[in-house]
């Protein structure tokens, strides 16, 4: 397995798909990286030369990936919570942030139901 920016990418998959295993690199970014380096998208990772892997690593190091990107996202969420914005409050309460209805659904974010017992009549 080749190691690019601290992530072991699978050998038997196409390069364009393998690069998406890196956090912060999606399909369009992977395609543009390979296009700038003139590497075919259809080639397998095991068929890459050491020089090609080194070039891909250098090109990907220009992007924010893995730890830097995760840290930036968590700091952005923390900042929203500190300034007390609406989005920050929704993050703090563990509710949907982007305007989704939460009256009936939103179970994924809210977690399992908390049932309340009825009083006997």
Curated annotation (Swiss-Prot):
Keywords: Ribonucleoprotein, Ribosomal protein, RNA-binding, rRNA-binding, tRNA-binding. GO terms for cellular component: cytosol; small ribosomal subunit. Pfam families: Ribosomal_S13. GO terms for biological process: translation. Residues 92-121 are annotated as: Disordered. Gene3D superfamilies: 1.10.8.50, 30s ribosomal protein s13, domain 2. The keyword Plastid does not apply. Residues 110-121 have a biased composition (Basic residues). InterPro entries: Rbsml_uS13_C, Ribosomal_uS13, Ribosomal_uS13-like_H2TH, Ribosomal_uS13_bac-type, Ribosomal_uS13_CS. One of its GO terms (molecular function) is structural constituent of ribosome. Part of the 30S ribosomal subunit. Forms a loose heterodimer with protein S19. Forms two bridges to the 50S subunit in the 70S ribosome. Located at the top of the head of the 30S subunit, it contacts several helices of the 16S rRNA. In the 70S ribosome it contacts the 23S rRNA (bridge B1a) and protein L5 of the 50S subunit (bridge B1b), connecting the 2 subunits; these bridges are implicated in subunit movement. Contacts the tRNAs in the A and P-sites. Belongs to the universal ribosomal protein uS13 family. This is Small ribosomal subunit protein uS13. It comes from Mycoplasma mycoides subsp. mycoides SC (strain CCUG 32753 / NCTC 10114 / PG1). The lineage of its organism: Bacteria, Bacillati, Mycoplasmatota, Mollicutes, Mycoplasmataceae. The gene is rpsM.
């Amino acid at each position: 397995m080749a190691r690019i920016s601290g992530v072991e990418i699978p050998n038997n998959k196409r390069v364009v798909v393998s690069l998406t295993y890196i956090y912060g690199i999606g399909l369009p970014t992977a395609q543009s990286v390979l296009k700038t380096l003139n590497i075919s998208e259809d080639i397998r990772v095991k068929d890459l030369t050491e020089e090609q892997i080194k070039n891909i690593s250098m090109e990907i190091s220009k992007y924010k990936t893995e730890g830097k990107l995760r840290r930036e996202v968590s700091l952005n969420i923390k900042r929203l919570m500190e300034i007390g914005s609406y989005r920050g409050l929704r993050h703090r309460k563990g509710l949907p942030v982007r305007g989704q209805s939460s009256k009936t659904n939103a179970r994924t974010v809210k977690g399992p139901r908390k049932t309340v017992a009825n009083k006997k009549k």
